[in-house]
Amino acid sequence: LYARFTAKFLRDDGVLPAKAGEPFKRLLAQGLVLGRTAKSSVSCAYLKPHEIDSATGVEIATGKAPAVSFEKMSKSKHNGTDPQQVVDEHGADTLRLFILFKAPYDDALMWEDKAISGPARFLRKLWAAIGEHIDKRGDGSDPDVINGDVTPSSLTVLTHATAERVTSALSTSFAFNTAVSDLMKLLNAICDAPDRGSADVRASLQTLVRLLAPFAPHFSAEAWAAIGDDRRDDVFEAGWPAADERVLRYRAVPFVIQLDGRGKGGTSVTQKDMDELDDEALEKRIREAGETVKVVGKRNVKAFRVNREKRVVSIITK
């Protein structure tokens, strides 16, 4: 509101151009933060936290379970949360990450103190992964370089795909919660890597820290000081990671497998296969995939069809 007023004032005063009256391209209306609310099943009065037995969850005065719901925070409903207490206990970055991850920005956010432990664990896990990489790092080689027929590792492909999705979430869809979820999935993949000291892991950690910076700036600054190529640079001066289209060609394209009309799991091929293989070659690739072979077993296949557009594999044995 004040930014729009200031922009219009400066425009009318001739400081800004005549077309500069609106400082924002789009208004993102945020959802309400709802607090856990307890209501007495006897008096229907809103209960204070100390009026409820923390062990059993029943109202101390009546011994009966209260009616619990999520409502707009207010003093009269005794369902408010002091953000400063959360910051003191978990840190500002953890609080910010929790708010962005808990729900889409335009949906109501149901506040639960216990749920903040999830983002807190994520940051601790990332910090531990950085420390483990530094301890195990050897001379190594450069991260996967896409030259000729060299195939990037699955971790490298996931890293570039994550960079693409997070960039889209911040610039187009504003799906901040899914962006944080993608970062968590990338960290899980990093922690599952067989060689934690490899150059691939280092490149993925560096990308993850830079993608995390808008969500957790203080943590990312400290993490970049430990893992960045030039430790003197701030994470916000390191540049935004861009997804390499040559790497993205190797990401998995899922296909659903239907056996005699019933879903039986799925398989996948790379985007490169989708682009380069004709229908016959693509069918051969999917037919020989381990997931397909497992589904078919010893059955006698009468028909095997691949629908490239719908990404469905139809197998008829009866």
Q: What are the residue ranges of the model-derived segments?
A:
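Short Ser/Thr-interspersed hydrophobic loop/turn segments at strand-loop and sheet-helix junctions
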Residues: 3-7
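Short, conserved secondary-structure transition motifs
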Residues: 29-39, 213
